[in-house]
Swiss-Prot record:
Annotated [4Fe-4S] cluster 2 binding sites: 53, 56, 61, 75
Catalysis performed (reactions): CO + 2 oxidized [2Fe-2S]-[ferredoxin] + H2O = 2 reduced [2Fe-2S]-[ferredoxin] + CO2 + 2 H(+)
Similarity remark: Belongs to the Ni-containing carbon monoxide dehydrogenase family.
Domain notes: Cluster B is an all-cysteinyl-liganded 4Fe-4S cluster; cluster C is a mixed Ni-Fe-S cluster which is the active site of CO oxidation. Cluster D is also an all-cysteinyl-liganded 4Fe-4S cluster that bridges the two subunits of the CODH dimer.
Function of the molecule: CODH oxidizes carbon monoxide coupled, via CooF, to the reduction of a hydrogen cation by a hydrogenase (possibly CooH).
Protein name: Carbon monoxide dehydrogenase 1
GO terms of molecular function: 4 iron, 4 sulfur cluster binding; anaerobic carbon-monoxide dehydrogenase activity; hydroxylamine reductase activity; nickel cation binding; peroxidase activity
NCBIfam families per record: CO_DH_cata
Annotated source species: Methanosarcina mazei (strain ATCC BAA-159 / DSM 3647 / Goe1 / Go1 / JCM 11833 / OCM 88) (Methanosarcina frisia)
């Protein structure tokens, strides 16, 4: 096997700001994720194929993919069983991450209603009452706090339910609900499905690949229509439902003369308070005393998306830019909560003056300053954290500072409510545009970054190809940040769209790519798709719509992909999931699910070919609806 040549900065990322910081890191002898990836090569083939099992201590067992060695594990598990079990455990972990996020949001909401979290309040009373009505909670003669208390109890009950249904699944079209029920995959309770995943994958329990994967779909639905949707909705009540606004993105948002505070992770419970604390007059005065012109908060990953959507707080970058933000030498504090935070940040921040501050009771990292965050004294803790950053400003080493000039304007804040409002209150104008052919369909492009592929290349080129062919794109997470950095989240980007989509965007004053939020906010896409399907009297699987995750890497993305497909949306993955060790599992995911759930996966690393797969699917659905 030949040696892999060391990648250049250009080969690692298409983003100019990232390329500059990668070169700076190399010149300074700083290790990044790309360096660690190269040291891992060649990666374990058994792991890549999904045919390694270590679920009991008789193993680990490996299946020979060429049929020349072991065909079964010690217990008799075949490649099909092992691959399916491993995939189910990935779905369980992803669903748990989203759903635990939701649980914390609801618990904060509950504490607020009980007067134990005074830093928080109700920002969207309209949504509060709407959600309460969905749960059959009477509003008559009750205060906002009383209604909120009953809603908090109802939402918490979704996690521990044993028989279901999860209330938000009622938002799906009737045809989809009937299908889930007939297949036995309607989720019963958020926690129950995740626990059952772990039970089923214990030695000697579920050993039929199809049966295992059907429970994977059920568990993912408890995420998409349960945990993630609960998180989105209750965060809107607490912090406000996003509306369109402008902001800026990329590493160039960092300031030369202000205290730079990075918020990184996924839970806005913390980041909302950090944004407020950064405007505290006492802390701003302290910043001046320390020689700074002010306090600049910028986001990384989804907690950044949350504050971007609601406050216009700038975004410094997506997942693979977290290290590069520190490499600028200009970050006083990297404040983290949970999910997608590299433990490598501990060593990295030690090379600069940056304080690496961990805050979550359930997540700590090497090399952190521990400042545990609790809702009961949320704002006070946030002030202490920001104060730590401000007091660190004089320690900045000017000789190490190099902030790329690249930053890009963007328009964000397209919640489902904001989109419907822009359309005049109903999806009818969008449906008319689709029926008339000006808009061919909708593409939902989401997901992570992955060092196995060039940073942002898949995200940006796939989306450009879709809008060029008159597909309106909705986006969340790290894809949204990639598109923003590429200038696709401004109305002027309509110039890159096909004539039909361009005309629609110009008429509405919107970009051809709509930023709908963080990863849990993919639930907003489900709500929008359901609204369109119900207006047409069809199932989601009948819509001219397709999904993609060009650079996915996390277990959360596996759960997302599963619930999107289970909801009826054909989805293209840009990096290969660990399933190729089983022909049966691969065939079920890429073909067989069409006959079961009305949608399936495809795997295509080339973003242009992936776009063609999505366009072909959209055209097929248009034809079936008689729209061609």
């Amino acid at each position: 096997m030949g040696c892999k040549m060391k990648q250049t900065a250009f080969e690692k990322s298409i983003d100019p700001a990232s390329q500059k910081m990668l070169e700076k890191a190399e010149n300074e002898g700083i290790e990044t994720a790309w360096d660690r990836y190269e040291k891992q090569l060649p990666q374990c083939s058994f792991g890549q194929l999904g045919i390694c099992c270590r679920n009991c201590n008789m193993g680990p067992c490996r299946i020979d993919p060429f049929g020349e060695g072991a065909e079964k594990g010690i217990c008799g598990a075949t490649a099909d069983i092992i691959v399916a079990r491993n995939l189910l455990r990935m779905i369980a972990a992803g669903a748990a991450a989203h759903s635990d996020h939701a649980r914390d949001a609801v618990l904060t909401f509950k504490k607020m209603t009980e007067g134990e979290a005074g830093s928080y309040g109700i920002k969207d009373k309209t949504k509060l009452f709407s959600l309460a009505s969905e749960y059959g909670i009477s509003l008559e003669g009750k205060s906002h706090e009383e209604v909120a208390g009953e809603l908090a109890s109802a939402l918490l009950a979704e996690f521990g339910k044993q028989e279901g249904p999860i209330q938000y699944t009622r938002r799906a079209p009737e045809a989809r609900l009937r299908l889930w029920t007939s297949l036995g995959i309607e989720p019963r309770g958020v926690d129950r499905e995740i626990v059952e995943c772990m039970h089923r994958t214990h030695i000697g329990v579920d050993n039929d690949a199809t049966h295992i994967l059907l429970h994977g779909l059920r568990t993912s639905l408890s995420d998409g229509w349960g945990g993630s949707m609960i998180a989105t909705e209750i965060q809107d009540v607490l912090f406000g439902t996003p509306e369109p606004k402008k902001s800026t993105v990329n590493l160039g948002v960092l300031s030369h003369d202000k205290v730079n505070v990075i918020i990184h992770g996924h839970e806005p419970i913390l980041s909302e308070m950090i944004v407020q604390a950064a405007e505290d007059p006492e802390l701003l005065e302290l910043a001046k005393e320390k020689g700074a012109a002010g306090i600049n908060v910028a986001g990384i990953c989804c907690t950044g998306n949350e504050t971007l959507m609601r406050h216009g707080t700038p975004i410094a970058g997506n997942f693979l830019q977290q290290e590069l933000a520190v490499v600028t030498g200009a970050v006083e504090a990297m404040i983290v909560d949970v999910q997608c935070i590299m433990p490598a940040l501990g060593n990295l921040t030690g090379c600069y003056h940056t304080k690496f501050i961990s805050t979550s009771p359930k997540a700590d990292f090497p090399g952190t300053v521990r400042m545990e965050f609790h809702e009961e004294r949320a704002y006070d803790t946030a002030r202490e954290i920001v104060r730590t950053a401000v007091e660190n400003f004089p320690n900045r080493n000017i000789e190490k500072v190099n902030i790329p000039e690249e930053k890009q304007e963007c328009m964000v804040g397209f919640s489902a409510e904001a989109i419907l409002k822009a359309l005049g209150g109903s999806p009818a104008p969008l449906i008319d545009a689709i029926a008339g052919g000006a808009v061919k369909g909708i593409g939902a492009v989401v997901g992570c970054n992955n060092v196995k592929v060039q940073h942002n290349y898949g995200h940006v080129n796939l989306v450009k190809e879709l809008i060029k062919n008159n597909v309106l794109v909705v986006t969340t997470g790290c894809n949204a940040i990639a598109c923003a950095e590429a200038g696709l989240l401004v109305p002027e980007a309509a110039a890159q769209a096909g004539d039909g989509l361009k005309g629609v965007c110009e008429a509405l004053g919107i970009p051809p790519v709509l930023h709908m939020g963080s990863c849990v906010d993919i639930s907003r896409i489900l709500v929008l798709a359901s609204a369109i399907a119900k207006s047409l009297g069809v199932d989601i699987s009948d819509l001219p719509a397709a999904g993609a995750a060009p650079e996915w890497m996390s277990e959360k993305a596996v759960s997302i992909g599963a619930y999107v497909v289970s909801s009826g949306v054909f989805t293209v993955l840009g990096t290969v999931p660990p399933v190729l060790g089983s022909q049966a599992v691969t065939a079920l995911l890429t073909k067989g699910l069409d006959n079961v759930i009305g949608a399936s996966f495809a795997v295509e690393p080339d973003p242009f070919k992936a776009a063609n797969l999505m366009l072909e699917h959209i055209e097929g659905k248009r034809k079936a609806l008689g729209l061609n």
